[in-house]
Swiss-Prot record:
InterPro entries: MraZ, MraZ_C, MraZ_dom, MraZ_N, MraZ_sf, SpoVT-AbrB_dom, SpoVT-AbrB_sf
Subcellular location: Cytoplasm, Nucleoid
Protein name in UniProt: Transcriptional regulator MraZ
GO molecular function: DNA-binding transcription factor activity; transcription cis-regulatory region binding
Signal sequence, renumbered to the chain: none
Organism annotation: Shewanella loihica (strain ATCC BAA-1088 / PV-4)
HAMAP family, A to Z: MraZ
Amino acid sequence: MFRGASAINLDAKGRIAIPKRYRERLHVDFNSQLVITVDFDAACLLIYPLEAWKAIEAKLLLLSDTQGPERAMKRLLLGYAHECELDSNGRLLLPPPLRQYANLDKHAMLVGQLNKFELWDEAAWQQQIELSRETIQSDAFANSERLADFSL
């Protein structure tokens, strides 16, 4: 499981170094095989171990090619999906279209989301955190049935 937020940098070639605390697990459990794609709801990237991504592809395969919203989701997630492997230094090369989608330049945040990572531009991440705080304090959050009994 991946958790925590790490400030990282992109190098001049568009590579990121995955923090050391995740590298061994990615290598041993997932053979360093990853898939990077875009988030359809935010300007960030999603990084999945290949095995987890295969389960998502199976769900996408069930979606229609003739229904607009389903086709749009398939087009976005699969069209940007890029299979890659960690290099010997624990780095991933982010293709230019993915960097552009998430407005990634130099400073980024790698955020563990249990089964995947999100990769954000650092400034966009700070804005997202503020929006998340506002959402948590809103009536919509308080009225959510799924969160009614959630406590820490």
